[in-house]
């Protein structure tokens, strides 16, 4: 599997699927499955039994995972979807940068 271009906390643009065109923040990355959970994207209804948090139970909306091939990071400078590159910083560590603007992410 190739390196993932998405990390927790990134703002991403959805480029395919039911939520195409929306942006959201990555809450969790599922590395082995190649999927990510994005805030407010791919919402599903889930039935829950009554518990201490929700004494009534019922139907709850929550985010489902989405494949990372359907996500693009958002350029911090322009606010549009971009591709990601990696380059060495002056300290010698690899940093991610936007291919469109050259800005570090």
Swiss-Prot record:
<comment type="function">
    <text>One of two assembly initiator proteins, it binds directly to the 5'-end of the 23S rRNA, where it nucleates assembly of the 50S subunit.</text>
</comment>
<dbReference type="GO" id="GO:0022625">
    <property type="term" value="C:cytosolic large ribosomal subunit"/>
</dbReference>
<dbReference type="InterPro" id="IPR005824">
    <property type="entry name" value="KOW"/>
</dbReference>
<dbReference type="GO" id="GO:0019843">
    <property type="term" value="F:rRNA binding"/>
</dbReference>
<keyword id="KW-0687">Ribonucleoprotein</keyword>
<keyword id="KW-0689">Ribosomal protein</keyword>
<dbReference type="GO" id="GO:0006412">
    <property type="term" value="P:translation"/>
</dbReference>
<feature type="region of interest" description="Disordered">
    <location>
        <begin position="67"/>
        <end position="105"/>
    </location>
</feature>
<dbReference type="Pfam" id="PF17136">
    <property type="entry name" value="ribosomal_L24"/>
</dbReference>
<dbReference type="GO" id="GO:0003735">
    <property type="term" value="F:structural constituent of ribosome"/>
</dbReference>
<dbReference type="InterPro" id="IPR003256">
    <property type="entry name" value="Ribosomal_uL24"/>
</dbReference>
<comment type="function">
    <text>One of the proteins that surrounds the polypeptide exit tunnel on the outside of the subunit.</text>
</comment>
<comment type="similarity">
    <text>Belongs to the universal ribosomal protein uL24 family.</text>
</comment>
<comment type="subunit">
    <text>Part of the 50S ribosomal subunit.</text>
</comment>
<keyword id="KW-0699">rRNA-binding</keyword>
<protein>
    <recommendedName>
        <fullName>Large ribosomal subunit protein uL24</fullName>
    </recommendedName>
</protein>
<dbReference type="Pfam" id="PF00467">
    <property type="entry name" value="KOW"/>
</dbReference>
<dbReference type="InterPro" id="IPR041988">
    <property type="entry name" value="Ribosomal_uL24_KOW"/>
</dbReference>
<dbReference type="InterPro" id="IPR014722">
    <property type="entry name" value="Rib_uL2_dom2"/>
</dbReference>
<dbReference type="InterPro" id="IPR008991">
    <property type="entry name" value="Translation_prot_SH3-like_sf"/>
</dbReference>
<keyword id="KW-0694">RNA-binding</keyword>
